[in-house]
């Protein structure tokens, strides 16, 4: 039996939460019911907190729309709060996560294994545009 998109989404969100917990963060995910889908600020699936670092994150499967990226980039949060988008990238040999971090007005991109190890860092400083 084929899994629903919602169930697959929950599984991906759970995996990201586990990675943050492995890195020492406390994680709070959105509480959802069958008929009520609410994200933090209608944009983020969860938040992670460690020391003085607060991260709001969004989890996507395979593709991220430019509109979603722009919305999250432009969403006003204090400069000390990070906005991170996790994109599941299925591969033939081994699936990985692409992590897009928006810190103040800069965008950073890296790749993380399913186990939470950073595989490759690609830093793109400066404005997203």
Model-derived segments and their meaning:
Residues 26-51:
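Active-site metal-binding core of divalent-cation-utilizing nuclease and nuclease-like domains
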Residues 28, 57, 84-86:
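Hydrophobic/aromatic beta-strand patches that form the interior of the parallel beta-sheet core
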Residues 20, 46-63:
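Conserved catalytic cores of phosphodiester-cleaving nucleases, focusing on short active-site segments
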Residues 28, 74-77:
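Surface-exposed substrate-engagement region within the catalytic domains
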Residues 20-21, 76-78:
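A generic structural signal for well-ordered alpha-helical segments
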Residues 1-34:
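Acidic-basic catalytic patches of nuclease active cores, encompassing PD-(D/E)XK
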Residues 7, 68-69, 77-129:
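Domain-level recognition of nuclease-like catalytic cores that cleave nucleotide substrates
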Residues 38, 55-74:
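Active-site-adjacent loop/helix micro-motif of nuclease/hydrolase catalytic cores
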């Amino acid at each position: 039996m084929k899994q629903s998109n919602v169930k697959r989404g929950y599984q991906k969100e759970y995996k990201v939460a586990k990675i943050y917990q492995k890195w020492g963060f406390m994680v709070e995910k959105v509480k959802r019911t069958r008929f009520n889908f609410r994200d933090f600020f209608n944009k983020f699936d969860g938040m992670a907190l460690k020391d003085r670092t607060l991260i709001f994150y969004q989890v996507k499967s395979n593709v991220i729309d430019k509109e979603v990226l722009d919305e999250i980039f432009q969403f006003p949060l204090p400069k000390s709060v990070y906005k991170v988008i996790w994109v599941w990238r299925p591969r033939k040999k081994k699936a990985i996560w692409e992590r897009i971090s928006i810190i103040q007005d800069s965008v950073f991109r890296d790749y993380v294994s399913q186990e939470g190890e950073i595989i490759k860092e690609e830093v793109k400083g400066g404005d997203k545009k």
